[in-house]
């Protein structure tokens, strides 16, 4: 019978890797706790309309990359391709904004039908924050600072923050008209994807990876030239806030985000730790999204990080599997019957305990215990089972002592 394999782009996380993931997730969780950001968990499966309305039907995500299907009730459903729209939907549905502004974080798997490559899979994992109901430019600064500080806490090196303002809706429409007019006169010089985007999502042309298109864009109208005075002042306040925190930034007038809901502040944090610059965090402000999804008008800002990309940057040494504290070794029927009860007692007092159930001789079991990195081995033979006196061996020094089974938990000293 043919061996079944995981689907392309759907990667198993094996035990050797999960300890590193747990460390990363716990580091982020503690970072968010100290920033007074509460966790929210949303379903993996949502109505397709949520993303069509929230992200934008003209985006690559909605047009090309979503996993969508009709369920048995003929409802169009989609595996979430990103987290923001789901968080906003949940906040609206459960009236969170009626309770005041919300500082939320989320984490978990997302799904996009893309070509798998290093740091990017079809099932991928993100963590992100969403500040809902915060209009002050200082909230943009704080959100960026939280991302920057988390990346530094994780040990990511070579960080660079790129910053832009997409302005208000009116600013973007003014710029869109100017850009479309300029590019239409040079349409034959654009790559095929950019020619298609000219009619559907022209701002995304600024993010083209085609070298010829990027060369052409050097002379294109600049988004900053279309900013109104209030938008320009807001942008200056964000930059001043970052400078006050000594967070270095580079203004990039070509920086746009791939989702339609962004406006005003947009940013990406990259790292050159792997050689080329790789984006590790992206986000910005999305003041119109809550209202667009049927909620009250609310100013919002947030960001997301891809965990697979972070794992590549962290390398193999970021966190190793934790060894057991104790390995319980037994030989003989009476002794083997005690092995699991002894392990259970030790676990109840906080020890990490492995039980060797191989049935091999004491020598082989002790050798395996030593290789495991454990500090202690508890040896139980039939004689120990009969007397109730167990052997405790220090695997670092080789010293042994006896300890009474009846008072094992009370007398155990690590």
UniProtKB/Swiss-Prot annotation:
Its EC number is 6.1.1.21. InterPro entries: aa-tRNA-synth_II, aa-tRNA-synth_II/BPL/LPL, Anticodon-bd, Anticodon-bd_dom_sf, His-tRNA-ligase, HisRS-like_core, HisRS/HisZ, HisRS_anticodon. It holds the Pfam family HGTP_anticodon. Keywords: Aminoacyl-tRNA synthetase, ATP-binding, Cytoplasm, Ligase, Nucleotide-binding, Protein biosynthesis. SUPFAM superfamilies: Class II aaRS ABD-related, Class II aaRS and biotin synthetases. GO terms for biological process: histidyl-tRNA aminoacylation. It is found in: Cytoplasm. Signal peptide: none annotated. CDD domains: HisRS-like_core (cd00773), HisRS_anticodon (cd00859). GO terms for cellular component: cytoplasm. It is an enzyme of class 6 (ligase). GO terms for molecular function: ATP binding; histidine-tRNA ligase activity. Gene3D superfamilies: Anticodon-binding domain, Bira Bifunctional Protein, Domain 2. The keyword Ribosomal protein does not apply. It catalyses: tRNA(His) + L-histidine + ATP = L-histidyl-tRNA(His) + AMP + diphosphate + H(+). HAMAP family: His_tRNA_synth (MF_00127). Belongs to the class-II aminoacyl-tRNA synthetase family. NCBIfam families: hisS (TIGR00442). Homodimer. This is Histidine--tRNA ligase. It comes from Synechococcus sp. (strain RCC307).
């Amino acid at each position: 019978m043919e061996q079944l394999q995981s689907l392309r782009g759907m990667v198993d996380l094996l035990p050797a890797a999960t300890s590193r993931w747990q460390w990363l997730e716990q580091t982020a969780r503690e970072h968010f706790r100290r920033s007074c950001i509460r966790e929210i968990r949303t379903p993996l499966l949502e109505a397709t309309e949520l993303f069509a309305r929230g992200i934008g039907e003209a985006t690559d995500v909605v047009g090309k990359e979503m996993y969508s299907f009709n369920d048995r009730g003929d409802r169009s459903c989609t595996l979430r391709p990103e987290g923001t729209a789901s968080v906003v939907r949940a906040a609206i549905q459960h009236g969170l904004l009626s309770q005041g502004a919300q500082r939320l974080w989320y984490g978990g798997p997302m799904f996009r039908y893309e070509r798998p490559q290093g740091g990017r899979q079809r099932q991928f994992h993100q963590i992100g924050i969403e500040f809902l109901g915060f209009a002050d430019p200082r909230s943009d600064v704080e959100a960026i600072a939280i991302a920057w500080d988390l990346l530094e806490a994780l040990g990511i090196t070579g960080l660079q923050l790129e910053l832009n303002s997409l302005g208000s809706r009116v600013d973007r429409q003014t710029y869109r008209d100017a850009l479309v007019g300029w590019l239409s006169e040079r349409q034959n010089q654009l790559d095929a994807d950019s020619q298609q985007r000219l009619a559907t999502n022209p701002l995304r042309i600024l993010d083209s990876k085609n070298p010829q298109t990027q060369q052409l864009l050097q002379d294109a109208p600049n988004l900053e030239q279309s900013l109104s005075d209030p938008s320009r002042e807001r942008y200056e306040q964000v930059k001043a806030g970052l400078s006050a925190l000594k967070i270095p930034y580079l203004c990039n007038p070509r920086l746009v985000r791939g989702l339609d809901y962004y406006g005003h502040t947009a940013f990406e944090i990259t790292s050159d730790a792997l050689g080329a610059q790789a984006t590790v965090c992206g986000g910005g402000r999305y003041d119109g999204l809550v209202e667009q999804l049927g909620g009250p008008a609310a100013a919002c800002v947030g960001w997301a990080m891809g965990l697979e990309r972070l794992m590549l940057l962290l390398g193999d040494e970021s966190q190793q599997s934790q060894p057991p504290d104790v390995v319980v070794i037994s030989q003989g029927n009476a002794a083997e019957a005690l092995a699991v009860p002894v392990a259970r007692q030790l676990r109840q007092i906080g020890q990490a305990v492995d039980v060797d159930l191989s049935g091999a001789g004491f020598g082989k079991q002790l050798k395996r215990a030593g290789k495991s990195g454990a500090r202690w081995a508890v040896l139980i033979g039939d004689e120990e089972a009969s007397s109730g006196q167990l052997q405790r061996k220090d695997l670092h020094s080789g010293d042994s002592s006896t300890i009474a089974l009846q008072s094992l938990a009370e007398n155990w000293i690590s």
